[in-house]
A protein has these predicted regions:
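N-terminal secretory signal peptides that target proteins for export/translocation
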Residues: 1-8
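Intrinsically disordered, low-complexity proline-rich regions
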Residues: 7, 13, 51-53
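Short N-terminal leader segment in a subset of presequences, especially plant chloroplast
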Residues: 9-13, 247-250
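Bacterial N-terminal signal peptides
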Residues: 11-22
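Structured extracytoplasmic
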Residues: 28-178, 185-189, 198-208, 215-216, ...
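Beta-strand-dense domains in secreted/periplasmic systems and polymorphic toxin scaffolds
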Residues: 193, 224-226
Length: 265
């Protein structure tokens, strides 16, 4: 029995890693109604805003930001936890990006299960580095080629006032998702993504939900918090959390821009 459980644990960690690296965005277990960043009510959409306009503005703003982003460094903490909050494994370190396609990660501390770090955390980090270099390419960008958007209103998300849209994938693909996106009305940047994979990933994955949250640092929008919630058949529920902190962008130390709710539209 111990041997079977050991093999199942290994298999589960591999499946969780597959989920995270396949989807490219990650998840958190809290429901929207319990999320303090979504305490504000959904407001009616202002007149004159169309899905086509939002897509066009997102593309142009993203192109400008990508061209201006030369480098960044961030301190990251990866954790695998259970629903009681017990940390089963943790890995912390410094992620460095250099335009156009180089990422490196330097580990500064490790805690908990070495097996989980080896089977889940290390492959996750390696996959991100390979994706940045172009060794793994899957077009999962939020563009008209991959998604239809249906604007449903506006909402304050923490510091940022956003358009809210349902994102509907145009094909059944494990690299795409179905859910909601929150788009900053001034910068046309993604503030929050929440949903689930467009394609069932495995017989073993009974449920998979995700959220990614971003923050504005200077003129750029970079990840703030990820969590992945996965319910695995015969094994239960696990959460992988990633915190992104202490950014240095283009040689400048972390300065989170406080944004008012006034729109530019």
């Amino acid at each position: 029995m111990l041997k079977i459980n050991y093999k199942l644990r290994i298999f589960v960690m591999l499946v969780v890693t597959w989920l995270i690296t396949a989807l490219g965005v990650t998840a958190q277990v809290i429901q929207e109604q319990g999320d303090p960043t979504l305490a504000a009510p959904l407001e009616p959409l202002r007149s004159g805003v169309t899905e086509e306009h939002v897509f066009a503005e997102m593309a142009s703003h993203n192109e400008l930001r990508s061209a201006a982003l030369l480098d960044y460094t961030a301190f990251r903490t990866y954790q695998v936890v259970d629903l009681k909050g017990k940390v089963h494994a943790e890995e912390s370190g410094r992620m460095e990006y250099r335009a156009p396609d180089k990422k490196t990660f330097v580990v500064t501390s490790e805690k908990g299960s070495g097996l989980i770090r080896h089977l889940a955390l290390n492959p996750l980090i390696a996959s991100e580095i390979e994706a940045a270099s172009g060794k793994q390419h899957h077009d999962s960008s939020i563009t008209p080629a991959n998604y239809s958007l249906h604007l449903v209103g506006e909402q304050q998300v923490g510091l940022y006032h956003c358009f809210v849209a349902q994102a509907v994938p145009k094909r059944v693909d494990k690299y795409l998702f179905e859910g909601k996106i929150w788009i900053d009305i001034q910068d046309f940047a993604i503030v929050r993504i929440a949903g689930h994979p467009a394609k069932k990933l495995s017989f073993w994955i009974e449920r998979a939900d995700f959220v990614r949250e971003y923050q504005k640092i200077d003129e750029f929008w970079l990840p703030r918090r990820d969590e992945t919630f996965v319910q695995v058949r015969l094994y239960g529920k696990k959460i992988l959390a990633i915190d992104h902190q202490d950014y240095t962008v283009n040689g400048m130390s972390n300065r989170v821009v406080l944004q008012t709710s006034a729109g530019s539209f």
